[in-house]
Amino acid sequence: MSATSASVTRHDWSLAEVKALFEQPFNDLLFQAQTVHRQHFDPNRVQVSTLLSIKTGACPEDCKYCPQSGHYNTGLDKEKLMEVQKVLEAAAEAKAIGSTRFCMGAAWKHPSAKDMPYVLKMVEGVKAMGLETCMTLGKLDQEQTRALAAAGLDYYNHNLDTSPEFYGNIITTRTYAERLETLSYVREAGMKICSGGILGMGESLDDRAGLLIQLANLPEHPESVPINMLVKVKGTPLAEEQDVDPFDFIRMLAVARIMMPKSHVRLSAGREQMNEQMQALAFFAGANSIFYGEKLLTTANPQADKDMQLFARLGIKPEERQEHADEVHQAAIEQALIEQRDSKLFYNAAV
């Protein structure tokens, strides 16, 4: 497959095709990925986000990789939902150090009706600062997605984690179909999708290919595709898994770039374990988004000044924020605003 033909947006990838991409000689794969990348992005710009945990620990889900799960003893301090003002202060700090997108994550199976008004205030406040907004709150219903869209949420993160075939080995408290359903509700409400997965959980090459097939064969590609490397946390069932081969991780980024040519491919969790050379190779493979700052939910992340020093050495600059939604998403958001006028989600939270 030529680099030119691979840059065409497709939604009909087969397992054989994707495995053939993975099995190319390393240099050929990276050349193809970089060629595709340059057709759609400035190769020397990287989108910069900051992620804040707005509610930490005691999650009822049993994701085997996650230190926030209430099923495992990881020594993580449990915290209630943050006050809106503290979230806004953190967002202001993120903007000051160069982030253009502020992502808020809560350890929930799904947000409760009691918490939704506070969550919506967070979105409105961060949006008012001129930052793009992103949240990950677990499973959503249609009413909740419409409320978030009406509040100004730009992106919703809901990872598929792995292939449908391997998924049951990692989590039993939420089905794959439920994850896909949430993504469909997010899209219907006019928000953009952030969805990816994790390497290093014991999955096979077929599973890695299967994850990318699920993402690329959605009706619309996710605008953001985070590729995580497992951060092994003592107390979780995956704490003793073998390390991911760095070249295998780079291959995953490159294949994601080829299959989803217009998506931002995010170098996400696990970056603390990557040296500068591996990160540079990741950018060459087509990764063009990072989380920036000291913490990534509950695990360490390279410090902001180290990121900027690496950017300077590589001649990379942070991507500027897009100020306007495209017409399709804007129309859907306006419809959500109309439908939201009579929403039952707005109530007196003091009651």
Curated annotation (Swiss-Prot):
The keyword Ribosomal protein does not apply. Pfam families: BATS, Radical_SAM. One of its GO terms (biological process) is biotin biosynthetic process. Binds 1 [4Fe-4S] cluster. The cluster is coordinated with 3 cysteines and an exchangeable S-adenosyl-L-methionine. Binds 1 [2Fe-2S] cluster. The cluster is coordinated with 3 cysteines and 1 arginine. [4Fe-4S] cluster binds at C59, C63, C66. Disulfide bonds: none annotated. Its EC number is 2.8.1.6. Belongs to the radical SAM superfamily. Biotin synthase family. Catalyzes the conversion of dethiobiotin (DTB) to biotin by the insertion of a sulfur atom into dethiobiotin via a radical-based mechanism. This is Biotin synthase. The lineage of its organism: Bacteria, Pseudomonadati, Pseudomonadota, Gammaproteobacteria, Pseudomonadales.
